[in-house]
């Protein structure tokens, strides 16, 4: 029956005591409105068997009168001994011969209508098990996916469930029941299964004894239509599906219409009439016998008050029932009875309410759900768990170390079982505080520990409460202490005589424990202990200090609390105290601070605050007020030791000492601190946060900034004011020599003398007649001497001695006299010299006749520098058969040639392919000779930051120059592409390397003429090389410039003098170097953006220069401005620039600001990029890996020429190789005369020793003979980006064919004082 509405709210909770081991009991719940109408809790033991209690007696006590079971109904292990105990307890008589016979039947389940979980019948020696009113098995909890599990019941003949209508969830397994004839053969399971397509039925070996002569011995009553649970007329199976009309899935037979009619849609398992009140069970929810869609909410909206109010008719949702209260073993979350709180919620076991609370980020403990036995895998997931939502069953063999993950567990919601373990204590549960017992082991135990023979002590020091369930501690033969523990303060459930529900037996004998001195510590009181240590006491006899019982408290760091009898710790910084606060210290551990905010009360701190400093006695004293909150090391106001660590405001004295100041603002620092002859400096000073005062110039009384200028620096002169011109006024200690004192100024103002006066002498006034001495000439007008720039026409001559203008030439007269005297002397010497020469000639002529006749006259040689050494560099001539030019891979183009990607196949290195760049010239014969000269120039130059040339190919279709291929391309594109990954370190490094290469060219007397980032190639992320020597020229030993008046060149990099003089020098290269550095700093931006080529010259003539980049410091920009001085002689040389950028490289962040977040370069990524670029450029024809193989390769082929020389007369040029400090090159990189294999052969790839890389390198031989594997990089220089009409060049010639030029068109390149010639890229 269902609850009548009138009594649905007066459920009684009847406690049930199930006996175990005689005197022990545990509490389950059973709520009844009458003895025949109860709600009961189920079990979850499955087919496991624990203990030896009276199972039949427990089943009767638990389930007699139950109408609904929340959980599983488990009828298991009812064997002969259980039946015997049942008969003895009920005084049932039986023939002694049939003592072991099975029970015929039991009637414990006569009132049962619903099972929320599963029905399990296992090894039950009962001939007939009847459930006369069971209608629904919901299967909310299934056993191995089964809602009905009947297994190994040898003596069971019938399981009768004649009212069963539906099994909502889970399958059916009926196995090894040989005498169960009806349920195995006479039941239509399609009528019972809610979803036959999903739910399965297994009936193996369950009716093999039910056949005789091939016919079933199970006979249904004739009214049952051959479908029944037993042989009686009341055992027929109820049919409510197969007989229904097609329009409905469940129906009932209507007597009024004598037909089957459809049930309400809210019904489950059929119905007895129309409407939701007559359902057998409910499809969704049931409220007081009526099937409904949802349970009424416990809070409803009150339209009058506009808020939620309590609903007196509201219910909790428990399964598919709407109830007034949730069962005690369940929690409550959002008006639903739940077994576990959902994610983001937790249940506080220390409170009396069972509501799931929403977690706060700082308060929610880590909750771990455990449903089954512990395994090695589940243990790993319990790391750091504070609550176990479930149970802990420790049955398998675990090591003590594995179980240490449970040390953080404080609460277990169900139970703990520990069986047959070999550890000595349970310290892995040392923080366990509460066992709730919301579900119990074997329906009774919250804590069960048995058969652990090595267990000596429990060590559950933190256990304070077991809310529900009993404690079982048995057969632990070495376990002491447990019998002395006061369990009444821990176990809430009470048994007989109102004693704790406890079963302790067959552990270590108490007297034997005393003999072994395994007893509680003397500081424990009579409540007992968990072990023998003083921290194992349940309660201390006297004092408790940090969890340990002691006789008395420690005097250091502790305070005695007479109320709680605890030794409480002082504040961590207190050594002794009279209270627990930070201000209750008597003495301190570290530093002592007298806090003025608390009446100068003593406070102990670990370190002094920033406004104080520690004395030798560890007392914190206040810093000087001028230190503000910047910290100090002493009481003074100076910056440094004994004073402030930093100054907010400061004054800097002449001896560079700095003292901190106070001020109301940075603009008033000097005035408020009485420093009239000081000014507020705008420069940063180390240790000063905002600003500081610096002393004015010694010539100024007061000033506003550094300097002596009256107007600009507002300098008030202390001595005199000097006016070199009307717009400039400077304070000085005394007037300079070339000045005069202005009258009526009290000797305080002096002006500069007239410009015709000699500036090394004083003057009387500012007129040309007031000079003490004239600079040029003097004209006397009476007694007045006037200084003039040149003599007047009436006095055309001057006296060289004093510059006086005369009307006669006094110098001519003196010259004539001197010439006569000198002529006479020279004539005498000439006659004597001729006589001596004649005698000498005669002697020489006679001596020659005596020499050997075969002596050949040597031609007269032009004198040269004796230190000049011959150029012994070797030139590699490469046959065209060893080159493959990839015409479809164009890397760049110039006015007279094009650069293609190609492959070099050395003749003597079999199966070797080297990626190269090939520059093909298409010019006439004269230009070819000039290109050959320039290529030879490139070949002899060797430096780390200059691109190396491999060799030449002289073919009919033009001269080809072969160089190393660099996949990373030119620096201009590289800066733009990798801007986000480059910083100050890389930018300054590139400038330094370019300066190093240009310094080498300067020493070799080579003018580059086209230095720019587009003509700088990237070898590696930290290594660049200067290229494009097509414009370079070598200076003769007696010339310092070359003049080019035609050709093509990019004007944005031209020095200002080239526009007018067409003259290239090292100084013009310095100008281009400055522009190149500007490009690097701006990550490849084009200079003079938005300006036409014609306006750049006027822009520079007006004194303008490229602007300071935002990431560039003043010091670095100042170096660029020096490179752009209008006077070439004022520009620094590359030797100076090399040293300056070398200094910049030491601390690049001081000169360039990192505008990007820079990460460390990934060398493997760089190599992969170069490898992919080579594969892409050469269509996979080159395998980069082959260059690291160990295989032997032949030497390079011998050149047709044994030696190539590049003769340059005089100068440092002959010492070309001595200027290279690096050991990466050798003078003769090709061994032309050798055919044997050598380890250091040029361009022979070697096996990479430490780490194999898949990047293709072009090998280059160093000076010391070692082979360098140079990684090749990307796009080449001279790559056209825009049409020629907007290329940024002027005087640009059209590309000519191989048609010979006229003499007027071809001007020769000349040095100074020689005829000017044409060059490919000239102005």
Swiss-Prot record:
Organism: Caenorhabditis elegans
Keyword line: ATP-binding, Cell membrane, Developmental protein, Disulfide bond, Glycoprotein, Kinase, Membrane, Nucleotide-binding, Phosphoprotein, Receptor, Signal, Transferase, Transmembrane, Transmembrane helix, Tyrosine-protein kinase
Glycan-carrying positions: 91, 169, 255, 376, 561, 655, 746, 776
Residues that, per the record, bind ATP: 891-899, 919
Reaction catalysis annotation: L-tyrosyl-[protein] + ATP = O-phospho-L-tyrosyl-[protein] + ADP + H(+)
Superkingdom of the organism of origin: Eukaryota
GO cellular component terms given for this protein: apical plasma membrane; basal plasma membrane; basolateral plasma membrane; cell-cell junction; lateral plasma membrane; plasma membrane; receptor complex
UniProt feature, compositional bias: Polar residues: 1265-1289
Signal sequence range: 1-20
Biased composition (Acidic residues): 1303-1315
Covalent S-S links between cysteines: 220-228, 224-236, 244-251, 248-262, 263-271, 267-279, 282-291, 295-322, 326-337, 341-356, 359-364, 520-529, 524-537, 540-549, 553-567, 570-577, 574-585, 588-604, 608-620, 623-632, 627-644, 647-660, 670-693, 696-703, 700-715, 717-731, 735-750, 753-763, 757-771, 774-787, 791-805
Record lineage: Eukaryota, Metazoa, Ecdysozoa, Nematoda, Chromadorea
Topological domain spans for side Extracellular: 21-818
Name of protein: Receptor tyrosine-protein kinase let-23
Top-level EC class as recorded in UniProt: transferase
Primary location group: membrane
């Amino acid at each position: 029956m269902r609850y009548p509405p009138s009594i649905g709210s007066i459920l009684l909770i009847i406690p049930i005591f199930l006996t175990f081991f005689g005197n022990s009991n545990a509490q389950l719940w059973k709520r009844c409105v009458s003895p025949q109408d109860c709600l009961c809790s189920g079990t979850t033991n499955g087919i496991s068997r624990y203990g030896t209690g009276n199972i039949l007696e427990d089943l009767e006590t638990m389930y007699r009168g139950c109408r609904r079971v929340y959980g599983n109904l488990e009828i298991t292990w009812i064997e002969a001994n259980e039946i015997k105990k049942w008969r003895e307890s009920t005084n049932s008589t039986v023939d002694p011969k049939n003592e072991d016979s099975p029970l015929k039947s039991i009637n414990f389940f006569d009132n049962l209508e619903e099972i929320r979980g599963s029905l399990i019948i296992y090894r039950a020696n009962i001939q007939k098990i009847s459930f006369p009113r069971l209608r629904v098995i919901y299967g909310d909890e299934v056993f191995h996916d089964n809602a009905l599990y009947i297994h190994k019941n040898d003596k069971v003949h019938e399981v009768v469930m004649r009212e069963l209508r539906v099994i909502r969830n889970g399958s059916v397994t009926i196995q090894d029941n040989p005498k169960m004839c009806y349920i195995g053969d006479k039941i239509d399971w399609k009528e019972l299964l809610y979803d036959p397509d999903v739910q399965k039925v297994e009936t193996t070996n369950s009716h093999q004894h039910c056949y005789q002569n091939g016919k079933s011995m199970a006979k249904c009553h004739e009214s049952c239509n051959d479908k029944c649970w037993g042989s009686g007329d009341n055992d027929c199976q109820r049919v409510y599906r197969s007989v229904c009309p097609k329009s409905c899935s469940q129906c009932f037979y209507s007597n009024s219409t004598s037909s089957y009619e459809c049930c309400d849609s809210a019904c489950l398992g059929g119905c007895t009439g129309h409407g939701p009140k007559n359902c057998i069970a409910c499809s969704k929810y049931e409220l007081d016998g009526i099937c409904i869609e949802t349970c009424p909410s416990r809070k409803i909206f009150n339209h009058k008050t506009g808020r939620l109010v309590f609903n007196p008719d509201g219910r909790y949702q428990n399964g598919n029932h709407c109830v007034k209260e949730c069962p005690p073993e369940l929690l409550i979350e959002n008006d639903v009875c739940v077994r576990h709180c959902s994610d983001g919620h937790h249940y506080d076991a220390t409170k009396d309410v069972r509501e799931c609370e929403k977690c706060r980020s700082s308060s929610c403990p880590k909750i771990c759900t455990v449903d089954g036995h512990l395994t090695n895998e589940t243990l790993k997931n319990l790391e750091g768990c504070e609550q176990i939502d479930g149970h802990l069953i420790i049955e398998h063999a675990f090591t003590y170390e594995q179980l240490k993950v449970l040390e953080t567990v404080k609460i277990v919601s169900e139970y703990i079982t520990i069986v047959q373990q070999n550890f000595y204590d349970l310290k892995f549960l040392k923080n366990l505080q509460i066992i709730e017992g919301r579900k119990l082991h074997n329906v009774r135990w919250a804590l069960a520990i048995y058969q652990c023979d090595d267990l000596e002590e429990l060590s559950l020091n933190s256990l304070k409460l077991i809310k529900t369930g009993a404690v079982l501690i048995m057969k632990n033969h070495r376990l002491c202490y447990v019998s002395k523990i006061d369990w009444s303060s821990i176990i809430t459930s009470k048994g007989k005589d109102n004693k704790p529900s406890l079963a302790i037996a067959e552990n270590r004998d108490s007297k034997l424990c005393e003999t072994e001195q395994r007893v509680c510590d003397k500081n424990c009181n009579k409540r007992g202990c968990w072990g023998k240590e003083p921290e194992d006491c349940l309660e201390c006899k006297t004092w408790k200090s940090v969890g340990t019982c002691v006789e008395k408290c420690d005097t250091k760091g502790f305070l005695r609390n007479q109320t709680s009898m605890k030794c409480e710790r002082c504040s961590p910084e207190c050594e002794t105290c009279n209270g627990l606060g930070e201000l209750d210290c008597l003495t301190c551990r570290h530093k002592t601070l007298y806090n003025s905010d608390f009446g100068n009360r003593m406070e102990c701190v670990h370190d002094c605050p920033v406004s104080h400093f520690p004395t030798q006695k560890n007392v914190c004293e206040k810093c000087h007020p001028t230190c503000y909150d910047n910290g100090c090391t002493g009481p003074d106001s100076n910056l440094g030791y004994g004073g402030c660590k930093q100054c907010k405001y400061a004054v800097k004295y002449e001896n560079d000492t700095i003292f901190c100041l106070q001020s109301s603002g940075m603009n008033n620092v000097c005035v408020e601190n009485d420093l009239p002859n000081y000014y507020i400096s705008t420069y940063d000073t180390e240790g000063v946060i905002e600003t500081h005062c610096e002393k004015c110039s010694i010539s100024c009384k007061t000033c506003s900034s550094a300097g002596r200028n009256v107007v600009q620096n507002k300098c008030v002169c202390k001595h005199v004011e000097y006016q070199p011109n009307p717009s400039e006024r400077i304070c000085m200690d005394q007037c300079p020599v070339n000045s005069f004192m202005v009258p009526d100024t009290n000797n305080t103002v002096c002006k500069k003398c007239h410009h015709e006066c000699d500036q090394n002498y004083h003057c009387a006034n500012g007129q040309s007649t007031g000079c003490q001495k004239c600079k040029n000439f003097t004209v006397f007008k009476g007694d007045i001497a006037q200084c003039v720039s040149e003599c007047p026409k009436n006095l055309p001559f001057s006296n060289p001695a004093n510059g006086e203008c005369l009307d006669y030439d006094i110098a001519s007269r003196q010259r004539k006299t001197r010439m006569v005297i000198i002529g006479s002397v020279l004539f005498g010497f000439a006659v004597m010299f001729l006589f001596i020469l004649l005698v000498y000639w005669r002697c020489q002529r006679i001596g020659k006749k005596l020499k050997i006749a075969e002596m050949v006259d040597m031609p007269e040689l032009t004198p040269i520098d004796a230190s000049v050494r011959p150029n012994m560099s070797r030139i590699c001539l490469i046959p065209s058969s060893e080159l493959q030019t990839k015409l479809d891979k164009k890397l760049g183009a110039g006015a007279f040639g094009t650069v293609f990607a190609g492959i070099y196949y050395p003749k003597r290195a079999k199966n070797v392919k080297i990626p190269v760049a090939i520059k093909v010239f298409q010019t006439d014969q004269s230009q070819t000779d000039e290109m050959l000269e320039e290529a030879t120039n490139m070949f002899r130059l060797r430096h780390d930051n200059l691109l190396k040339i491999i060799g030449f190919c002289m073919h009919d279709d033009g001269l080809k120059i072969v160089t190393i291929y660099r996949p990373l391309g030119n620096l201009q594109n590289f800066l733009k592409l990798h801007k986000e990954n480059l910083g100050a370190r890389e930018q300054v490094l590139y400038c330094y390397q370019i300066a190093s290469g240009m310094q080498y060219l300067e020493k070799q007397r080579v003018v580059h003429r086209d230095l720019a980032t587009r003509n700088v190639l990237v070898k590696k992320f930290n290594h660049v090389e200067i290229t494009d020597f097509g414009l370079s020229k070598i200076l003769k030993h007696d010339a310092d410039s070359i003049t080019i008046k035609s050709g093509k060149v990019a004007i944005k990099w031209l020095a200002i003098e080239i526009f007018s003089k067409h003259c290239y020098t090292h100084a013009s290269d310095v100008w281009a170097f400055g522009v190149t550095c500007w490009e690097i700093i701006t990550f490849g931006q084009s200079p003079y953006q938005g300006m036409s080529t014609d306006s750049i010259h006027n822009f520079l003539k007006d004194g303008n220069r490229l602007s300071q980049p935002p990431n560039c410091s003043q010091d670095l920009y100042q170096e660029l401005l020096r490179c752009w001085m209008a006077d070439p002689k004022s520009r620094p040389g590359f030797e100076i620039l090399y040293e300056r950028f070398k200094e910049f490289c030491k601390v690049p962040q001081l000169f360039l600001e990192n505008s990007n977040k820079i990460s460390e370069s990934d060398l493997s990524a760089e190599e992969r990029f170069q490898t992919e670029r080579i594969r892409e450029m050469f269509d996979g024809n080159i395998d980069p890996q082959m260059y690291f193989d160990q295989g032997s390769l032949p030497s390079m082929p011998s050149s047709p020429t044994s030696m190539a020389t590049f003769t340059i007369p005089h100068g440092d040029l002959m010492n070309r190789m001595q200027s290279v400090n690096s050991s990466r090159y050798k003078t003769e990189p090709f061994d032309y005369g050798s055919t044997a294999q050598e380890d250091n052969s040029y361009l022979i790839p070697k096996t990479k020793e430490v780490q194999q890389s898949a990047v293709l390198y072009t090998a280059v031989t160093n000076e010391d003979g070692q082979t360098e594997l140079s990684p090749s990089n990307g796009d080449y220089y001279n790559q056209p980006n825009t049409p020629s009409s907007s290329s940024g060049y002027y005087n640009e010639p059209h590309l000519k064919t191989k048609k010979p030029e006229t003499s007027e068109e071809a001007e020769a390149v000349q040095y100074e004082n020689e005829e000017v010639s044409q060059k490919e890229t000239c102005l």
